[in-house]
Amino acid sequence: MDDELFMRKAIALSKAAAEHGNEPFGAVLVKDGEIVFTNENQVHTRHDPTFHGEAGLIREFCGATGITDLRDYTLYS
C-alpha cells in the first residue's frame, strides 16, 4: 500500500472541507491498495455535529454498500 499517497488524499480532502466552511478534516477508506470511499468533515454544512470526516465516511460507505465488517479496510485521516 502507498500510505503517503492515501494520506495526501486525506490532506487534500481536509483542505476541501475548510474551503466548504467546515473544520479541516478528511478521510480515505482503502481496501486492497485501492481507494474505495472518501469523505470530508461536513459538521457545519450538514448542521450535524457528528458528521466528522471519519464518522461520516463510515456512515455513508456502510449505508451505500450494506457492508458493516470493515476489518479488511484501512482508514486514513
Language model features by range: what are they?
Residues 10, 14-17, 27, 53, ...:
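Small-residue (primarily alanine) positions within well-ordered alpha-helices
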Residues 25-33:
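Short beta-strand scaffold segments in enzyme catalytic cores
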Residues 5, 34, 56:
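Active-site phosphate/pyrophosphate-handling residues
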Residues 2-22:
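Short, basic/aromatic recognition patches
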Residues 37-77:
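Zn2+-dependent cytidine deaminase-like catalytic core
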Residues 21-25, 71:
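Short, basic and Ser/Thr-rich N-terminal targeting/leader segments
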